[in-house]
Amino acid sequence: MEANFVSSALAGVQNNRSVKRSLDRLKSLFSSGQHQLNGSLGKKVFILLALGGGAFSLVKFYKAKNEGSSKQSGLIIDLKDKNSKKDKKRNVTRVDAVFFRRLAKIIRIVIPSLKSKEFLSLLYLTALLFARTMLSVSIAEIAGKNAQNLVARKWKEMRNGVLKFALVSIPASFVNASLKYETDMLALRFRKRLSEYVHKEYLEGVNFYKASHLGGADRIDNADQRVTSDIEQFCNSMSSLYTTLFKPFLDLVLFTRKLVVVMGWGSPLLMFSYFIVSGFLKKLIMPPFGRLTAKQSELEGNYRTVHQRLITNAEEIAFYDGSRKERQIINLSFGDIYNHTGYVSYLKCLVGIFDGFLVKYCASIVGYGCMVLPIYTGIRGSSGKDSTELTKDYIRNTQLMVALSQAIGQLVLLGNKVTLMAGYTSRVSELLEMIKSIKERGTSQFTIVHEDDVPNPLTNSPVNDKYDTSVDMSSWLEDWRKRSDQTRIVKRQQSNRSSASGATTVYGGGTFVEGDFIKFENVSIVSPEGKLLVENLDFQVMPNQNVMITGPNGSGKSSLFRILGELWPLHCGTVIKPRKEDILFVPQKPYLVLGTLRDQIIYPHSHDDMKKLGVTDDDLQHLLATVDPNLTIIRQWNWDDTKDWFTALSGGQKQRIAMARLFYHRPQYAILDECTSAVSDEVEGKIYETCKKLGITLFTVSHRPQLRAYHDYVLLFNGRGGWEWSKIDHDDDHLKKPLSH
């Protein structure tokens, strides 16, 4: 049946005159070329490879080298300075001389010598690839002979052919499974070698500290992402790239050699010519997958970072009741990943459609032409063969042509994987280059920058002329207090519609009661480990009565505030306190949210929340000016500037930001945990004066005696479960009326 189909197809083609004339011209071309090719078979194969596979590789690498003109939108939440020239330079990911130089350096790390396990594994993988190609050629020969015997009804030969196929399938199965295993193991060995090298260099001395704190221009983002995920992806990509490159090239050599023997050089040349044209067409539409891959890794690193920040600053965020804001940040970060991944998947889909049409289906059409032309032209005696011989040649040549077209197609698609690998190579190389730069710099001293050499932010600021310094701050603070009181009244009215005032909540073994003051009645503070920190605590704080809390480390000072913030359950007793939004915690190391300068002041509010409250940027400037008299912050940055504020701000500026945040929210009670240690005595005094004007009652954790002037009571923990409550006599500057337990 197969032979009849082939004969009918050829007869139909020959009956069409127009097609026949075209085939006659091709026949003369093929015949002349066949007689002119008198050199060795190796020379013929070399010419075909030079015209075919080499051209495809050049096309793809030329495409990759000149990619990068496309632009991709950046992060909604950027964890580094977008204006950094260093970052802009790093974001360029191309397959160029820099890529090959970086790749060569990494290869010398993962394959240190010819005697290494990695190189031996590479040799074994090469042998498996060669064996697989030879087995494919054998299977094609067996399939062709089996088809011939089937058409000729030679059942004995057919049985022997099936037996040969079964015998060949045994080593073929072993080779196929071993190829997958060795590819994975090679990637794993690469990762082990590269990870150990990075660990050695990154953790040598204090390089890890310098990388995150003293890196300067060499500091990079998401070092943890690069050390873990990016190294893994790079090693997987490099291992896969070797098999993707070597096997198609080997198939190209062996299958072309076999096809030239049985079909002549015309059909392979036609196939090569088609793929050259399709390669140039593909070059025109190929997106910059290398840069998109690097962007994907960056977004994944940012997503991991926001989760790490949540874990690291969990207590501060809980005190601020910032879960809603953090959820928005995390959702935005994941949204960036979702949008970018969807965009990349869409591009891959379009490229896949183009690849499927050109590389698979159109290549099959060209392959059919390659199969028909040798038979029609009579090359290699095809015209004199009977139907069984034609069937054998058809089946065998079909399998060889399919394998050859797949090999060429893989070489055409090789550029995709190279550009993807370029993204991971860039990420890993930046990490290695940063470590090398830090080691070369060693312990060299910092360069002194004189004030005359840099622009003065106080005179070159975009908001320098916008801030009105003539405002009477006392009057403005009084007005701010009235506005805050009105806002609090509205919020309470809205809240009371859904819950009764003075609500009682049983939490753990004790009871929380809502009130306008703070009172502890027979409260024992127990740590999560079961340690009794404070026993039977009993005191009361009315509005405008500031309390100073002292005691040794681990005595229960911070634990008291965890009880107030309802982070810990009550072991026993009763706590009367205002609503959670009326108590604000200011830690020693302020929490700085991902976002703009404005977000640092209004956290956990959003910009829309701020507008709904009727607060303007001018109000924020006045609040910040109360703790930053020299206006160093508001004159150096705009409110919409986005930076890594943890590194951009000094210790004193961070504490000023935290106090401005306190004044913005203006709670009834505030807990200050050594939060003024980095500001001057003058600014510190102004902070306490402002709190008094705004009607904020303070709990201050501090051991500095000079702060007693701003407080009315002292709560002392002795570290053994005992405590002492005393009133401060400001006339004699000492404590009186102690109440101990």
UniProtKB/Swiss-Prot annotation:
The chain crosses the membrane at residues 39-59, 119-139, 260-280. Residues 131-409 form the ABC transmembrane type-1 domain. It is found in: Membrane. Pfam families: ABC_membrane_2 (PF06472), ABC_tran (PF00005). ATP binds at residues 551-558. Coiled coil: none annotated. Its main location: membrane. Gene3D superfamilies: ABC transporter type 1, transmembrane domain (1.20.1560.10), P-loop containing nucleotide triphosphate hydrolases (3.40.50.300). InterPro entries: AAA+_ATPase, ABC1_TM_dom, ABC1_TM_sf, ABC_transporter-like_ATP-bd, ABC_transporter-like_CS, ABC_transporter_sub-D, P-loop_NTPase. The keyword Membrane applies. PANTHER family: ATP-BINDING CASSETTE SUB-FAMILY D MEMBER 1, ATP-BINDING CASSETTE, SUB-FAMILY D MEMBER. This is ABC transporter D family member 2. It comes from Dictyostelium discoideum.
